[in-house]
């Protein structure tokens, strides 16, 4: 072998480039590639300077908080205005009172509607000039039983029509529409009568709807008895329920329509008080008529 090849060739000497700080005559910008590397081995990002990030966060956070607060205030104001407008048309807060019931109240109230003859205390209890919720007072009117009884009446009517091969959605719809129409007519007639007689009472329209809707409980009992025992069972049960509803309405409405005389302990005398008593009896007496009119065609 050659003697020169036995030795490693000496390393080539690296030629240093020109000083970066000395710019050539034709160079437009300084070459900073040879400058010191920042701590961490990363170069600063010139597109987003570090000094601008805290300032931007400081400015954007108050603006976002202000926008959120302003939006929440607008939403709360809009909700409040909507609730006020709805309450003007439909008193939602008052209607909630009529659905404040429980299972015990529903059972006792249905028993009172079917057997009102042994009940003694018919006065509605008050707490701070406000009637207590129905679940605490069996004498308080409610809408839960009338609404559920109305729906159940429509279902039982459909069952009765089905057993007679007369069921159709159109007939069932007419049945529901006629029952609702008669209820509205009844309530409007009572309101007109109270206005003509000039009765100062705390009865509201919702109270009248509740009292007028209690008769559906007896109507359901009559139709079911007719399906099980024929016309004889229908007439017997419907007659009992009709008399019970008349007794219930007289004892309940007497304290409402004759509230002034009852509060003063005055006997029902004079033309005005007698007219109020006749009105109470008329409202109660019309209940069995509606009960028969809306159910007689369902039993054959």
Curated annotation (Swiss-Prot):
Broad class of where this protein is predominantly found: endoplasmic reticulum
Taxonomy, superkingdom: Eukaryota
Cytoplasmic side: 1-142, 200-205, 249-278
BP GO terms, sorted: cilium assembly; endoplasmic reticulum to Golgi vesicle-mediated transport; protein transport; sperm flagellum assembly
Phylogenetic classification of the source organism: Eukaryota, Metazoa, Chordata, Craniata, Vertebrata
UniProt similarity note: Belongs to the YIF1 family.
Listed InterPro entries: Yif1_fam
Source organism of this protein record: Xenopus tropicalis (Western clawed frog)
Subcellular location: Endoplasmic reticulum membrane; Golgi apparatus membrane; Endoplasmic reticulum-Golgi intermediate compartment membrane
Annotated region (Disordered), positions in chain: 1-46
Extracellular side: 164-178, 227, 300
Annotated protein name in UniProt: Protein YIF1B
Pfam families assigned to the protein according to its UniProt record, in alphabetical order: YIF1
Protein's job: Functions in endoplasmic reticulum to Golgi vesicle-mediated transport and regulates the proper organization of the endoplasmic reticulum and the Golgi. Plays a key role in targeting to neuronal dendrites receptors such as HTR1A. Plays also a role in primary cilium and sperm flagellum assembly probably through protein transport to these compartments.
Keywords from the UniProt entry: Endoplasmic reticulum, Golgi apparatus, Membrane, Protein transport, Transmembrane, Transmembrane helix, Transport
Membrane topology, record value: Multi-pass membrane protein
The UniProt record lists the keyword Thylakoid: no
Statement: the UniProt record of this protein carries the keyword tRNA-binding: no
């Amino acid at each position: 072998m050659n003697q020169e090849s036995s030795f490693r060739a000496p390393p080539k000497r690296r030629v240093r480039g020109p000083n970066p700080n000395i710019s050539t005559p034709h160079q437009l910008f300084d070459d900073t590639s040879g400058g010191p590397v920042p701590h961490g081995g990363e170069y600063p990002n010139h597109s987003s300077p570090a000094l601008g990030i805290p300032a931007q966060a400081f400015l954007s956070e108050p603006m976002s908080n202000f926008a959120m607060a302003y939006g929440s205030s607008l939403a709360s104001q809009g909700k409040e205005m909507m609730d006020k407008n709805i309450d003007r048309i439909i008193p939602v807060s008052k209607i909630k009172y009529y659905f404040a019931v429980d299972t015990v109240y529903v059972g006792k109230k249905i028993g009172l509607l079917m057997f009102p003859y042994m009940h003694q205390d018919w006065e509605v209890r008050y707490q701070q000039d406000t009637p207590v919720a129905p679940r605490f007072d069996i004498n308080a009117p409610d809408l839960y039983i009338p609404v559920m009884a109305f729906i159940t009446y429509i279902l039982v009517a459909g069952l009765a029509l089905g057993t007679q091969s007369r069921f159709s959605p159109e007939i069932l719809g007419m049945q529901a529409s006629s029952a609702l129409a008669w209820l509205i007519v009844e309530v409007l007639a009572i309101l007109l009568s109270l206005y003509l007689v000039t009765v100062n009472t705390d009865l509201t329209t919702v109270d009248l709807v509740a009292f007028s809707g209690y008769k559906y409980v007896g109507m359901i009992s009559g139709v079911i008895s007719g399906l099980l025992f024929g016309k004889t069972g229908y007439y017997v049960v419907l007659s009992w329920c009709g008399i019970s509803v008349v007794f219930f309405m007289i004892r309940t409405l007497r304290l409402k329509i004759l509230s002034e005389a009852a509060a003063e302990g005055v006997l029902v005398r004079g033309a005005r008080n007698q007219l109020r008593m006749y009105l109470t009896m008329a409202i109660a007496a019309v209940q069995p008529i509606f009960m028969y009119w809306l159910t007689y065609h369902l039993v054959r």
